[in-house]
Amino acid sequence: MPSIKNYLSLVKFSHTIFAMPFAIIGFFLGIFDFSYNLEMIKLPYRPYSGIPKLKISPISALANYHIITFVLVLLCMITARSAAMAFNRYLDRQFDAKNPRTAIREIPAGIISEKNALFFTILMCVLFVTCTYFINSICFYLSPVALFVILFYSYTKRFTFLCHLVLGVGLSLAPIGAYLAVTGTFAILPVLFSIAVICWVSGFDIIFALQDEAFDKENNLYSIPAVMGKAKALNISSFLHFLSAAAIIFAGFYGYFSWFYWLGTAVFCGMLIYQHAIVKPTDLSRVNIAFMTANGIASVVFAVFVLLDLILLNKATWALNFLF
């Protein structure tokens, strides 16, 4: 029987580091923009307002509301991403078995059966939708749309080289979704962060796909490196990362952030430049460093500085009530 560790490996749980920080950014932006009318607390969590003879201060009620929402957002991120990754592994199992780079993955290696991988995918989808139900109605109603986007990605490499952008769109739902979880509304600032995520993820996925250029060509799979070659693919990746940096910078001005934000932006942009400096069309030896290390640092450090800007510089005083 497969272990929990096997399933964590199946879905590459460590790669959660890419989108999760942006979900947390979206969540805290939502706290900043939230209309702190106590009547709103009663909408998503009726039990907290309906328990008889229980007196809760407004601050405590608000803190409870946000803590529960935060946990549900994290669960949504984990379950949605796990569903998408497991489905991708299930759908690509035959290609993975033929590719020397991926033949050691859990399904082609026989560690996790096809049936178990599919069941795991369905289970994660059910848990995701269930979590959205307990957040608010708009998240619940939009949950099938989110699942469609992230599951549909696995098919795209079979017919379009724009598959990288579809992956970016899937991960870009993180900041918008987390913001919706808190506010129940859309806003420009989380959308700007989502645009940054689309371009950022698409760009580094192109870099990662450089490794499979020959295999993709041989097996009629579409990717920008397979269709356009390594050199052009890296140029497109660079352009997408330029757009990502531009969206981050524009969001900084639009949101009137201060120096903490700009420090985070400097690190984020620096990591984008770094990964393009170490990967060349003739030298792919450091693709994994560019893919995992550089982008992991970029997302985590940027999120930390954004949160410092929001909390320590009093741009979201209610966030302090949530934390303390």
For the regions a protein language model found, what residue spans apply to each?
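Membrane-spanning helices that line or support transport/gating and their immediate boundary helices
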Residues: 86-94, 206-213
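Intramembrane alpha-helical segments
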Residues: 8-9, 38, 75-77, 82-83, ...
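Helix-coil boundary and interhelical linker segments in multi-pass alpha-helical membrane proteins
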Residues: 27-74, 127-141, 176-195, 247-262, ...
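The first (N-terminal) embedded transmembrane alpha-helix
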Residues: 12-31, 168, 172, 303
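Multi-pass membrane catalytic core of lipid/isoprenoid biosynthesis enzymes
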Residues: 65-79, 93-143, 218-264, 304-305
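Residue-level recognition of pore/gate-forming positions within transmembrane alpha-helices
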Residues: 23, 27, 77, 125, ...
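C-terminal membrane-associated helical module and adjoining short loops/tails
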Residues: 1-16, 111-112, 182, 193-324
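Residue-level signal for short hydrophobic patches within transmembrane helices
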Residues: 4-14, 71, 75, 79, ...
